[in-house]
Amino acid sequence: LINVIAGNSSEDLAKKISKKLKANLIKSELKIFPDGESKITLKGKFVRGKTIVVQSIYPPVDSNLIQALALISKAKEYSSEVIIVVPYLGYARQDREFLPGEIVTMKVIGKLLKGAGATRIIVTDIHSKIGLQQLGLKSKNVSAIPELVKYFKKLKLENPLVVSPDQGGKGRANEFAKVFKLDFIALQKVRDRKTGKVKIKNQKISEVRDRDLILVDDMISTGGSIVKATEFLKKQKCRRVFVTCTHALLINDAEKKIKKAGVTRIISTNSIPGKTSVVDISNIIAKAIK
């Protein structure tokens, strides 16, 4: 028998996972006090067996992390095996010491999850495989690419081409293109480590002309890279630009900025719930748990 605890950040996704596993769903009620503290009350009874905690760690990252730890800790009182499902794992970009004195927060997160009682972690399209190793926990990284491609196949696209906004995302765009049986290209971007400013290095790309483009990324935060890439591609006389990612954080008015740059649509998964999260990953997560 399996228990699934629905964390506040992933309520809907947890319900779907629970249904697919025919599990015992335990809901959680969250109360935030005026001083910012959170208090969680679980609603439901535990059955004997392993427990899955589903809690995505997106903004407010620290609150969602503390809540995940609290849920794991409670689950551990009833189950010896506690699997934490964190579709979007905040801090995944802090996976190494880029500048002297920086703290590799992923190592800290690993200690916290283990200390709370997690025996295994399941994530979706983590930003860096190195980060996953830093956790020091038994882990599984599930790819949402097949699910995203399935969705795009239903759209009527005109001679589509897959584009990576930078060289770093080449592998991901290549995988997306392979599953979709399409070609792909990668732009070259330079980011200033100190200011975070981004610019595109390419001069001209002829193969995008009059084609629908699918810009593929693992996550979109402020949308800076996507905006720069879209503006560049629009200048090259492409047709429409679609943006897809697993995790759409879309901080502040990122969505507005991206649309203003000329993007037709943003399509993301429900690792982070929102307007763009039309692709469901409960299936692939349920498979990973089994």
Segments from the language model and where they lie:
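PRPP-associated nucleotide enzymes
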Residues: 1-290
